[in-house]
A protein has these predicted regions:
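Generic structural signal for hydrophobic core residues of well-folded globular domains
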Residues: 37, 57-61, 219-222, 346, ...
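Conserved catalytic cores of very large enzyme subunits
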Residues: 76-80, 84-516, 536, 542-564
Protein backbone atom coordinates (compact mmCIF):
# COMPACT_ATOMS: atom_id res chain seq x y z
CA UNK A 1 0.00 0.00 0.00
CA UNK A 2 2.87 2.37 0.75
CA UNK A 3 4.32 1.48 -2.67
CA UNK A 4 1.02 2.32 -4.36
CA UNK A 5 0.64 5.67 -2.61
CA UNK A 6 4.25 6.66 -3.33
CA UNK A 7 4.02 5.81 -7.04
CA UNK A 8 0.62 7.49 -7.25
CA UNK A 9 2.10 10.68 -5.80
CA UNK A 10 5.00 10.50 -8.25
CA UNK A 11 2.59 10.16 -11.20
CA UNK A 12 0.59 13.16 -9.97
CA UNK A 13 3.78 15.23 -9.64
CA UNK A 14 4.64 14.79 -13.34
CA UNK A 15 1.14 15.94 -14.34
CA UNK A 16 -0.01 12.56 -15.53
CA UNK A 17 -3.71 11.87 -15.20
CA UNK A 18 -4.85 9.52 -12.49
CA UNK A 19 -7.45 7.37 -14.25
CA UNK A 20 -8.33 3.67 -14.42
CA UNK A 21 -5.33 2.94 -16.66
CA UNK A 22 -2.94 4.53 -14.20
CA UNK A 23 -4.61 2.73 -11.30
CA UNK A 24 -4.07 -0.59 -13.09
CA UNK A 25 -0.45 0.33 -13.82
CA UNK A 26 0.17 1.17 -10.16
CA UNK A 27 -1.54 -2.01 -8.97
CA UNK A 28 0.42 -4.19 -11.40
CA UNK A 29 3.69 -2.54 -10.44
CA UNK A 30 3.02 -3.00 -6.72
CA UNK A 31 2.11 -6.65 -7.24
CA UNK A 32 5.29 -7.15 -9.27
CA UNK A 33 7.44 -5.64 -6.51
CA UNK A 34 5.67 -7.62 -3.80
CA UNK A 35 6.24 -10.81 -5.79
CA UNK A 36 9.96 -10.09 -6.13
CA UNK A 37 10.21 -9.36 -2.40
CA UNK A 38 8.68 -12.75 -1.55
CA UNK A 39 11.07 -14.51 -3.94
CA UNK A 40 14.22 -12.75 -2.76
CA UNK A 41 13.71 -12.37 0.99
CA UNK A 42 12.88 -14.96 3.61
CA UNK A 43 11.93 -12.28 6.15
CA UNK A 44 11.02 -8.58 6.01
CA UNK A 45 12.87 -6.64 3.31
CA UNK A 46 14.74 -3.44 4.11
CA UNK A 47 13.18 -0.17 3.00
CA UNK A 48 16.17 0.57 0.75
CA UNK A 49 15.75 -2.76 -1.07
CA UNK A 50 12.04 -2.15 -1.64
CA UNK A 51 12.75 1.33 -3.00
CA UNK A 52 15.37 -0.07 -5.39
CA UNK A 53 12.88 -2.61 -6.74
CA UNK A 54 10.27 0.12 -7.32
CA UNK A 55 12.77 2.31 -9.18
CA UNK A 56 13.87 -0.57 -11.42
CA UNK A 57 10.25 -1.49 -12.17
CA UNK A 58 9.44 2.09 -13.18
CA UNK A 59 12.47 2.25 -15.48
CA UNK A 60 11.63 -1.12 -17.05
CA UNK A 61 8.15 0.26 -17.86
CA UNK A 62 9.81 3.34 -19.44
CA UNK A 63 8.26 5.66 -16.87
CA UNK A 64 11.43 7.72 -16.63
CA UNK A 65 9.89 10.96 -15.34
CA UNK A 66 7.91 9.07 -12.74
CA UNK A 67 11.07 7.17 -11.74
CA UNK A 68 12.94 10.45 -11.32
CA UNK A 69 10.14 11.91 -9.18
CA UNK A 70 9.95 8.71 -7.13
CA UNK A 71 13.72 8.91 -6.57
CA UNK A 72 13.30 12.44 -5.21
CA UNK A 73 10.46 11.21 -3.00
CA UNK A 74 12.70 8.40 -1.79
CA UNK A 75 15.49 10.86 -1.01
CA UNK A 76 13.12 13.07 0.99
CA UNK A 77 11.96 10.07 3.00
CA UNK A 78 15.55 8.94 3.57
CA UNK A 79 16.41 12.40 4.84
CA UNK A 80 13.38 12.42 7.15
CA UNK A 81 14.38 9.03 8.56
CA UNK A 82 17.97 10.14 8.99
CA UNK A 83 16.87 13.31 10.78
CA UNK A 84 14.55 11.35 13.05
CA UNK A 85 17.45 9.21 14.23
CA UNK A 86 20.10 11.97 14.29
CA UNK A 87 20.86 13.22 17.80
CA UNK A 88 22.46 16.39 16.43
CA UNK A 89 19.30 17.14 14.47
CA UNK A 90 17.26 16.63 17.66
CA UNK A 91 19.44 19.12 19.53
CA UNK A 92 19.19 21.59 16.64
CA UNK A 93 15.39 21.40 16.75
CA UNK A 94 15.48 22.24 20.43
CA UNK A 95 17.89 25.15 19.97
CA UNK A 96 15.74 26.52 17.14
CA UNK A 97 12.60 26.32 19.32
CA UNK A 98 10.78 23.94 16.99
CA UNK A 99 7.15 24.41 18.13
CA UNK A 100 6.33 20.71 17.61
CA UNK A 101 8.97 19.96 20.23
CA UNK A 102 8.57 22.91 22.60
CA UNK A 103 4.77 22.69 22.84
CA UNK A 104 4.30 18.93 22.58
CA UNK A 105 2.98 18.55 26.15
CA UNK A 106 0.43 20.99 27.57
CA UNK A 107 1.22 19.77 31.11
CA UNK A 108 4.73 21.19 30.87
CA UNK A 109 5.61 24.88 30.99
CA UNK A 110 8.35 25.14 28.38
CA UNK A 111 9.53 28.46 29.86
CA UNK A 112 10.86 26.67 32.94
CA UNK A 113 14.47 25.49 32.98
CA UNK A 114 13.58 22.05 34.31
CA UNK A 115 11.12 21.55 31.47
CA UNK A 116 13.62 22.77 28.88
CA UNK A 117 16.16 20.28 30.15
CA UNK A 118 13.59 17.49 29.97
CA UNK A 119 12.53 18.47 26.43
CA UNK A 120 16.15 18.39 25.31
CA UNK A 121 16.69 15.00 26.93
CA UNK A 122 13.46 13.75 25.40
CA UNK A 123 14.43 14.89 21.91
CA UNK A 124 17.76 13.09 22.19
CA UNK A 125 16.05 10.00 23.62
CA UNK A 126 13.56 9.86 20.73
CA UNK A 127 16.36 10.03 18.19
CA UNK A 128 18.31 7.33 19.99
CA UNK A 129 15.19 5.18 20.41
CA UNK A 130 14.68 4.83 16.67
CA UNK A 131 18.18 3.38 16.42
CA UNK A 132 17.58 1.00 19.33
CA UNK A 133 14.22 -0.40 18.24
CA UNK A 134 13.96 -3.37 15.88
CA UNK A 135 13.97 -1.90 12.37
CA UNK A 136 10.48 -3.12 11.53
CA UNK A 137 9.15 -1.44 14.70
CA UNK A 138 11.03 1.81 14.11
CA UNK A 139 9.82 1.98 10.50
CA UNK A 140 6.21 1.30 11.51
CA UNK A 141 6.40 3.99 14.19
CA UNK A 142 7.84 6.59 11.81
CA UNK A 143 5.21 5.78 9.18
CA UNK A 144 2.42 5.99 11.75
CA UNK A 145 1.30 2.37 11.38
CA UNK A 146 1.84 1.95 15.11
CA UNK A 147 2.76 4.35 17.89
CA UNK A 148 5.55 3.44 20.29
CA UNK A 149 4.47 5.56 23.26
CA UNK A 150 6.81 7.62 25.45
CA UNK A 151 9.84 7.34 23.19
CA UNK A 152 11.25 10.41 24.94
CA UNK A 153 11.99 8.11 27.91
CA UNK A 154 11.92 4.52 26.71
CA UNK A 155 13.78 2.56 25.37
CA UNK A 156 16.69 4.99 25.85
CA UNK A 157 16.31 4.27 29.57
CA UNK A 158 15.00 1.04 31.04
CA UNK A 159 12.23 2.87 32.91
CA UNK A 160 8.78 1.36 33.33
CA UNK A 161 5.44 3.05 32.78
CA UNK A 162 2.66 3.48 35.40
CA UNK A 163 2.32 1.70 38.73
CA UNK A 164 0.65 1.11 42.08
CA UNK A 165 3.67 1.74 44.34
CA UNK A 166 3.50 -0.06 47.65
CA UNK A 167 3.52 3.08 49.77
CA UNK A 168 2.05 1.09 52.63
CA UNK A 169 4.96 -1.35 52.93
CA UNK A 170 7.35 1.58 52.79
CA UNK A 171 5.54 3.49 55.53
CA UNK A 172 5.13 0.42 57.73
CA UNK A 173 8.68 -0.92 57.42
CA UNK A 174 10.73 2.18 56.70
CA UNK A 175 12.76 3.14 53.65
CA UNK A 176 15.67 5.25 52.49
CA UNK A 177 15.19 8.31 50.32
CA UNK A 178 18.36 9.91 49.02
CA UNK A 179 20.68 10.07 52.02
CA UNK A 180 17.92 9.93 54.62
CA UNK A 181 16.72 6.70 56.24
CA UNK A 182 13.04 7.08 57.16
CA UNK A 183 11.36 5.33 60.07
CA UNK A 184 7.69 4.42 60.16
CA UNK A 185 5.64 7.60 60.82
CA UNK A 186 3.96 8.16 64.16
CA UNK A 187 1.24 10.52 62.87
CA UNK A 188 -1.02 11.07 59.89
CA UNK A 189 0.82 14.33 59.12
CA UNK A 190 4.21 12.64 58.81
CA UNK A 191 2.67 9.78 56.83
CA UNK A 192 1.19 12.25 54.33
CA UNK A 193 4.50 14.08 54.01
CA UNK A 194 6.45 10.86 53.50
CA UNK A 195 4.00 9.72 50.81
CA UNK A 196 4.49 12.92 48.82
CA UNK A 197 8.26 12.53 49.11
CA UNK A 198 8.01 8.97 47.82
CA UNK A 199 5.71 10.08 45.00
CA UNK A 200 8.24 12.64 43.86
CA UNK A 201 11.01 10.07 43.68
CA UNK A 202 8.81 7.47 41.99
CA UNK A 203 7.80 10.05 39.37
CA UNK A 204 11.47 10.66 38.60
CA UNK A 205 12.10 6.92 38.21
CA UNK A 206 9.27 6.02 35.83
CA UNK A 207 7.47 7.88 33.06
CA UNK A 208 3.84 6.98 33.81
CA UNK A 209 1.37 7.87 36.52
CA UNK A 210 1.18 6.40 40.02
CA UNK A 211 -1.64 5.69 42.43
CA UNK A 212 -2.01 5.50 46.18
CA UNK A 213 -4.37 2.53 46.17
CA UNK A 214 -7.07 2.35 48.90
CA UNK A 215 -5.41 5.27 50.65
CA UNK A 216 -8.10 5.81 53.29
CA UNK A 217 -7.84 2.25 54.58
CA UNK A 218 -4.04 2.24 54.70
CA UNK A 219 -3.63 5.69 56.25
CA UNK A 220 -6.16 4.97 59.00
CA UNK A 221 -3.52 3.31 61.19
CA UNK A 222 -1.49 6.54 61.30
CA UNK A 223 -4.56 8.62 62.14
CA UNK A 224 -5.17 6.20 64.99
CA UNK A 225 -1.70 7.01 66.33
CA UNK A 226 -2.75 10.67 66.46
CA UNK A 227 -5.92 9.71 68.29
CA UNK A 228 -3.94 7.79 70.89
CA UNK A 229 -1.69 10.81 71.40
CA UNK A 230 -4.65 13.19 71.67
CA UNK A 231 -6.37 10.83 74.12
CA UNK A 232 -3.34 11.04 76.41
CA UNK A 233 -3.45 14.83 76.12
CA UNK A 234 -7.17 14.79 76.87
CA UNK A 235 -6.46 12.88 80.07
CA UNK A 236 -4.27 15.81 81.11
CA UNK A 237 -6.87 18.37 80.02
CA UNK A 238 -9.67 16.44 81.70
CA UNK A 239 -8.04 14.88 84.78
CA UNK A 240 -9.68 12.44 87.11
CA UNK A 241 -11.92 14.20 89.58
CA UNK A 242 -12.97 17.00 87.23
CA UNK A 243 -16.73 17.58 87.28
CA UNK A 244 -18.33 15.94 84.28
CA UNK A 245 -20.24 19.11 83.37
CA UNK A 246 -17.00 21.09 83.26
CA UNK A 247 -15.41 18.45 81.02
CA UNK A 248 -18.49 18.46 78.78
CA UNK A 249 -18.25 22.23 78.34
CA UNK A 250 -14.64 21.84 77.14
CA UNK A 251 -15.74 19.27 74.58
CA UNK A 252 -18.67 21.42 73.44
CA UNK A 253 -16.36 24.41 73.01
CA UNK A 254 -13.97 22.35 70.88
CA UNK A 255 -16.89 21.11 68.80
CA UNK A 256 -18.23 24.63 68.35
CA UNK A 257 -14.88 25.77 66.90
CA UNK A 258 -14.60 22.76 64.59
CA UNK A 259 -16.45 24.14 61.51
CA UNK A 260 -14.09 27.13 61.30
CA UNK A 261 -11.01 24.92 61.66
CA UNK A 262 -12.28 22.63 58.90
CA UNK A 263 -13.27 25.62 56.73
CA UNK A 264 -16.90 24.55 56.59
CA UNK A 265 -18.21 28.00 55.70
CA UNK A 266 -21.97 27.70 55.33
CA UNK A 267 -21.83 23.92 55.48
CA UNK A 268 -23.90 22.25 58.20
CA UNK A 269 -21.67 21.40 61.21
CA UNK A 270 -21.04 17.75 61.94
CA UNK A 271 -23.13 16.26 64.76
CA UNK A 272 -21.57 15.79 68.16
CA UNK A 273 -19.21 12.84 68.20
CA UNK A 274 -19.78 9.76 70.30
CA UNK A 275 -17.07 7.92 72.25
CA UNK A 276 -15.54 4.70 71.01
CA UNK A 277 -16.36 3.05 74.31
CA UNK A 278 -19.56 3.40 76.29
CA UNK A 279 -18.49 0.98 79.00
CA UNK A 280 -15.99 3.45 80.53
CA UNK A 281 -16.69 6.25 82.99
CA UNK A 282 -18.18 9.53 81.80
CA UNK A 283 -14.92 11.49 82.00
CA UNK A 284 -13.14 8.94 79.81
CA UNK A 285 -15.99 9.16 77.31
CA UNK A 286 -15.58 12.95 77.15
CA UNK A 287 -11.84 12.50 76.66
CA UNK A 288 -12.47 10.14 73.75
CA UNK A 289 -14.81 12.65 72.12
CA UNK A 290 -12.26 15.46 72.55
CA UNK A 291 -9.53 13.24 71.08
CA UNK A 292 -11.78 12.50 68.11
CA UNK A 293 -12.35 16.20 67.45
CA UNK A 294 -8.62 16.92 67.55
CA UNK A 295 -7.83 13.88 65.40
CA UNK A 296 -10.31 15.02 62.75
CA UNK A 297 -8.46 18.35 62.54
CA UNK A 298 -5.09 16.54 62.30
CA UNK A 299 -6.45 14.39 59.47
CA UNK A 300 -7.81 17.44 57.65
CA UNK A 301 -4.45 19.23 57.93
CA UNK A 302 -2.57 16.14 56.74
CA UNK A 303 -4.76 15.76 53.65
CA UNK A 304 -4.36 19.48 52.96
CA UNK A 305 -0.59 19.07 53.23
CA UNK A 306 -0.68 16.19 50.77
CA UNK A 307 -2.78 18.18 48.29
CA UNK A 308 -0.49 21.22 48.41
CA UNK A 309 2.74 19.25 48.31
CA UNK A 310 1.67 17.17 45.31
CA UNK A 311 0.65 20.28 43.38
CA UNK A 312 3.80 22.20 44.30
CA UNK A 313 6.18 19.36 43.45
CA UNK A 314 8.08 19.48 40.18
CA UNK A 315 10.07 16.38 39.33
CA UNK A 316 12.92 15.61 36.95
CA UNK A 317 10.69 15.66 33.86
CA UNK A 318 9.72 19.27 34.48
CA UNK A 319 6.12 18.74 35.56
CA UNK A 320 3.93 17.95 38.53
CA UNK A 321 3.89 14.18 39.09
CA UNK A 322 0.78 12.44 37.78
CA UNK A 323 -0.67 11.12 41.01
CA UNK A 324 -4.00 9.44 41.71
CA UNK A 325 -5.52 8.73 45.11
CA UNK A 326 -7.99 5.85 45.31
CA UNK A 327 -10.35 5.79 48.30
CA UNK A 328 -13.90 5.17 49.47
CA UNK A 329 -14.00 1.65 50.93
CA UNK A 330 -12.86 2.18 54.53
CA UNK A 331 -15.69 2.05 57.05
CA UNK A 332 -13.97 2.55 60.40
CA UNK A 333 -14.02 6.02 61.95
CA UNK A 334 -10.47 6.92 60.92
CA UNK A 335 -10.87 5.86 57.28
CA UNK A 336 -14.18 7.74 57.07
CA UNK A 337 -12.58 10.92 58.36
CA UNK A 338 -9.74 10.57 55.86
CA UNK A 339 -12.30 10.30 53.06
CA UNK A 340 -14.12 13.36 54.38
CA UNK A 341 -10.90 15.38 54.64
CA UNK A 342 -9.80 14.50 51.09
CA UNK A 343 -13.14 15.67 49.71
CA UNK A 344 -13.45 18.80 51.87
CA UNK A 345 -9.96 19.93 50.89
CA UNK A 346 -10.71 19.42 47.21
CA UNK A 347 -14.00 21.32 47.47
CA UNK A 348 -12.25 24.22 49.22
CA UNK A 349 -9.60 24.61 46.51
CA UNK A 350 -6.04 25.89 46.57
CA UNK A 351 -4.88 29.28 47.84
CA UNK A 352 -6.83 32.41 48.63
CA UNK A 353 -8.59 32.27 45.26
CA UNK A 354 -9.59 28.63 45.82
CA UNK A 355 -8.29 27.28 42.51
CA UNK A 356 -9.31 23.76 41.54
CA UNK A 357 -6.43 21.39 42.22
CA UNK A 358 -5.09 19.53 39.19
CA UNK A 359 -3.58 16.71 41.21
CA UNK A 360 -3.99 14.31 42.77
CA UNK A 361 -6.63 12.79 40.54
CA UNK A 362 -9.25 11.40 42.91
CA UNK A 363 -10.97 8.05 42.33
CA UNK A 364 -13.86 7.25 44.65
CA UNK A 365 -15.11 3.67 44.85
CA UNK A 366 -18.78 2.76 45.26
CA UNK A 367 -19.56 -0.66 46.71
CA UNK A 368 -22.83 -2.30 47.71
CA UNK A 369 -23.06 -2.52 51.47
CA UNK A 370 -20.52 0.27 51.97
CA UNK A 371 -21.78 3.46 50.35
CA UNK A 372 -24.23 2.61 47.57
CA UNK A 373 -27.63 2.75 49.28
CA UNK A 374 -29.01 5.23 51.86
CA UNK A 375 -28.81 2.58 54.58
CA UNK A 376 -25.10 1.89 53.91
CA UNK A 377 -22.62 3.22 56.52
CA UNK A 378 -20.73 5.49 54.12
CA UNK A 379 -23.66 6.75 52.08
CA UNK A 380 -23.10 10.28 53.46
CA UNK A 381 -19.55 10.23 52.10
CA UNK A 382 -20.76 9.14 48.68
CA UNK A 383 -23.07 12.16 48.71
CA UNK A 384 -20.11 14.36 49.63
CA UNK A 385 -18.07 12.79 46.80
CA UNK A 386 -20.82 13.58 44.30
CA UNK A 387 -20.98 17.17 45.58
CA UNK A 388 -17.22 17.41 45.15
CA UNK A 389 -17.42 16.07 41.60
CA UNK A 390 -20.04 18.64 40.62
CA UNK A 391 -17.91 21.48 41.99
CA UNK A 392 -14.35 20.35 41.23
CA UNK A 393 -14.63 17.75 38.41
CA UNK A 394 -13.15 15.02 40.61
CA UNK A 395 -13.46 12.45 42.04
CA UNK A 396 -14.02 10.01 39.25
CA UNK A 397 -16.35 7.25 40.39
CA UNK A 398 -15.67 3.54 39.92
CA UNK A 399 -17.78 0.58 40.94
CA UNK A 400 -16.14 -2.12 43.03
CA UNK A 401 -18.18 -5.03 41.69
CA UNK A 402 -17.58 -4.08 38.05
CA UNK A 403 -13.82 -3.83 38.48
CA UNK A 404 -13.71 -7.23 40.19
CA UNK A 405 -15.84 -8.73 37.40
CA UNK A 406 -13.68 -7.29 34.61
CA UNK A 407 -10.18 -7.56 36.09
CA UNK A 408 -10.50 -10.34 38.65
CA UNK A 409 -9.84 -8.26 41.76
CA UNK A 410 -10.27 -4.73 43.02
CA UNK A 411 -7.73 -1.96 42.62
CA UNK A 412 -7.64 1.69 41.58
CA UNK A 413 -6.31 2.59 38.12
CA UNK A 414 -2.58 3.23 37.75
CA UNK A 415 -2.26 6.98 37.26
CA UNK A 416 -4.84 7.94 34.67
CA UNK A 417 -6.72 4.87 33.46
CA UNK A 418 -4.84 1.56 33.16
CA UNK A 419 -5.99 -1.24 35.46
CA UNK A 420 -3.90 -4.21 36.48
CA UNK A 421 -5.41 -7.66 36.08
CA UNK A 422 -6.01 -9.74 39.18
CA UNK A 423 -2.86 -11.59 40.25
CA UNK A 424 -2.24 -14.10 43.01
CA UNK A 425 1.26 -14.18 44.44
CA UNK A 426 2.34 -17.83 44.07
CA UNK A 427 4.48 -17.55 47.20
CA UNK A 428 1.69 -16.32 49.48
CA UNK A 429 -1.44 -17.51 47.67
CA UNK A 430 -2.96 -14.05 48.18
CA UNK A 431 -4.18 -11.36 45.77
CA UNK A 432 -1.50 -8.75 45.25
CA UNK A 433 -2.06 -5.33 43.72
CA UNK A 434 0.31 -2.87 45.39
CA UNK A 435 3.88 -2.89 44.17
CA UNK A 436 2.91 -3.86 40.61
CA UNK A 437 3.41 -1.95 37.39
CA UNK A 438 2.99 -1.61 33.63
CA UNK A 439 6.05 -1.81 31.38
CA UNK A 440 4.80 0.25 28.44
CA UNK A 441 2.27 0.85 25.70
CA UNK A 442 2.10 0.39 21.92
CA UNK A 443 -0.94 1.45 19.88
CA UNK A 444 -2.11 0.33 16.44
CA UNK A 445 -3.43 2.83 13.87
CA UNK A 446 -6.57 0.93 12.80
CA UNK A 447 -8.10 3.59 10.46
CA UNK A 448 -4.96 3.52 8.34
CA UNK A 449 -5.42 -0.22 7.85
CA UNK A 450 -9.02 0.40 6.75
CA UNK A 451 -7.97 3.06 4.24
CA UNK A 452 -5.23 0.86 2.85
CA UNK A 453 -7.73 -1.98 2.40
CA UNK A 454 -9.82 0.01 -0.13
CA UNK A 455 -13.02 -1.66 1.04
CA UNK A 456 -11.59 -5.19 0.88
CA UNK A 457 -12.26 -6.84 4.24
CA UNK A 458 -10.01 -9.81 3.54
CA UNK A 459 -7.16 -7.41 2.95
CA UNK A 460 -8.13 -5.51 6.12
CA UNK A 461 -7.81 -8.62 8.28
CA UNK A 462 -4.53 -9.56 6.62
CA UNK A 463 -3.07 -6.11 7.29
CA UNK A 464 -4.43 -6.05 10.84
CA UNK A 465 -2.68 -9.33 11.61
CA UNK A 466 0.57 -7.95 10.16
CA UNK A 467 0.38 -4.72 12.20
CA UNK A 468 -0.48 -6.67 15.31
CA UNK A 469 2.63 -8.77 14.82
CA UNK A 470 4.71 -5.58 14.61
CA UNK A 471 3.02 -4.30 17.78
CA UNK A 472 3.80 -7.63 19.45
CA UNK A 473 7.48 -7.25 18.56
CA UNK A 474 7.41 -3.71 19.95
CA UNK A 475 5.89 -4.85 23.25
CA UNK A 476 8.34 -7.72 23.58
CA UNK A 477 11.13 -5.19 23.11
CA UNK A 478 9.64 -3.04 25.87
CA UNK A 479 9.67 -6.02 28.24
CA UNK A 480 13.23 -6.93 27.30
CA UNK A 481 14.42 -3.34 27.83
CA UNK A 482 12.78 -3.02 31.26
CA UNK A 483 14.47 -6.24 32.34
CA UNK A 484 17.82 -4.55 31.71
CA UNK A 485 17.27 -2.20 34.66
CA UNK A 486 19.20 -2.87 37.84
CA UNK A 487 18.04 -2.16 41.41
CA UNK A 488 20.58 0.63 41.79
CA UNK A 489 19.04 2.48 38.82
CA UNK A 490 15.91 3.21 40.88
CA UNK A 491 16.47 2.39 44.56
CA UNK A 492 13.06 3.63 45.69
CA UNK A 493 11.35 1.30 43.25
CA UNK A 494 13.47 -1.81 43.48
CA UNK A 495 15.32 -1.68 46.81
CA UNK A 496 13.18 0.21 49.30
CA UNK A 497 9.70 -1.14 48.72
CA UNK A 498 7.78 0.73 46.02
CA UNK A 499 8.01 -2.33 43.74
CA UNK A 500 9.98 -4.66 46.01
CA UNK A 501 13.00 -4.97 48.27
CA UNK A 502 15.77 -6.43 46.12
CA UNK A 503 19.47 -6.56 46.74
CA UNK A 504 21.74 -4.26 44.75
CA UNK A 505 22.71 -7.04 42.34
CA UNK A 506 19.39 -8.89 42.10
CA UNK A 507 17.54 -9.40 38.83
CA UNK A 508 14.56 -7.02 38.51
CA UNK A 509 12.73 -9.54 36.32
CA UNK A 510 11.54 -11.33 39.44
CA UNK A 511 9.23 -8.32 39.96
CA UNK A 512 7.92 -8.51 36.37
CA UNK A 513 7.61 -12.19 35.49
CA UNK A 514 4.69 -14.60 35.93
CA UNK A 515 2.27 -11.83 34.88
CA UNK A 516 3.07 -9.65 37.91
CA UNK A 517 3.72 -6.78 35.49
CA UNK A 518 1.71 -5.90 32.39
CA UNK A 519 2.21 -4.34 28.98
CA UNK A 520 -0.58 -2.57 27.10
CA UNK A 521 -1.78 -2.77 23.52
CA UNK A 522 -3.83 0.21 22.41
CA UNK A 523 -5.75 1.13 19.30
CA UNK A 524 -7.19 4.30 17.80
CA UNK A 525 -10.12 5.04 15.53
CA UNK A 526 -12.53 2.14 15.88
CA UNK A 527 -15.50 4.31 14.86
CA UNK A 528 -13.59 5.81 11.92
CA UNK A 529 -12.47 2.36 10.80
CA UNK A 530 -16.04 1.12 10.78
CA UNK A 531 -17.10 4.23 8.84
CA UNK A 532 -14.75 3.26 5.99
CA UNK A 533 -16.76 0.07 5.45
CA UNK A 534 -20.26 1.11 6.58
CA UNK A 535 -20.41 4.83 5.91
CA UNK A 536 -19.87 7.79 8.19
CA UNK A 537 -23.45 7.61 9.48
CA UNK A 538 -23.14 4.10 10.88
CA UNK A 539 -23.45 5.69 14.33
CA UNK A 540 -26.71 7.60 14.66
CA UNK A 541 -28.46 9.30 17.53
CA UNK A 542 -29.40 6.66 20.08
CA UNK A 543 -28.23 3.78 17.91
CA UNK A 544 -25.90 2.31 15.31
CA UNK A 545 -25.88 0.06 12.30
CA UNK A 546 -25.98 -3.54 13.68
CA UNK A 547 -23.52 -4.86 11.09
CA UNK A 548 -21.19 -1.95 11.73
CA UNK A 549 -21.32 -2.56 15.46
CA UNK A 550 -20.58 -6.25 14.97
CA UNK A 551 -17.63 -5.40 12.71
CA UNK A 552 -16.22 -2.95 15.27
CA UNK A 553 -16.55 -5.55 18.02
CA UNK A 554 -14.91 -8.19 15.83
CA UNK A 555 -11.81 -5.97 15.53
CA UNK A 556 -11.45 -5.70 19.29
CA UNK A 557 -12.16 -9.41 19.71
CA UNK A 558 -9.44 -10.25 17.19
CA UNK A 559 -6.95 -8.04 19.01
CA UNK A 560 -7.92 -9.71 22.28
CA UNK A 561 -7.44 -13.18 20.75
CA UNK A 562 -3.98 -12.27 19.52
CA UNK A 563 -3.04 -10.90 22.94
CA UNK A 564 -4.01 -14.20 24.56
Amino acid sequence: TTIKSAVKSAIADVDKKDGPQEEKLIRDLANQVEGEIKERYAGPAKIEDIQNLVEHALIEDHLYDVARTYTNYRLDKDIQRAKATDVNEAVARFINNDPTLIHENANKDSNVYATQRDLLAGAVSKAAALNMLPQVVANAHMKGDIHFHDADYSPFTAQSNCSLPNFWDMLANGFTLGNAPMASPKSIAIAATQITQIMKDVASSQYGGQTANRADEHLARYAKKDYEKFLEEARETIPDGMPVEFARRQVESAKKNEPAKLHFGSREPLPMDTPFHTDVDELEQEREILAKIRTRKAIYDAMQTMEYQINSNRVSNGQTPFVTVGFGLGTDWFAREIQRAILLNRIRGLGKDHHTAIFPKLVFTIKHGVNCEPEDPNYDLKQLALECATKRMYPDVVFYENIVKITGSFKAPMGCRSFLQGWVNPETGKDEEDGRMNLGVVSVNVPRIALESHGDKDRFWKLLNERMEVAHQALQFRIMRCKEATPVNAPTLFRFGAFGRLGANDNVDQLFKNERATVSLGYIGLAETTAVFYGKNWIRDHGWDPEGKEFALSIVKRMNELCK
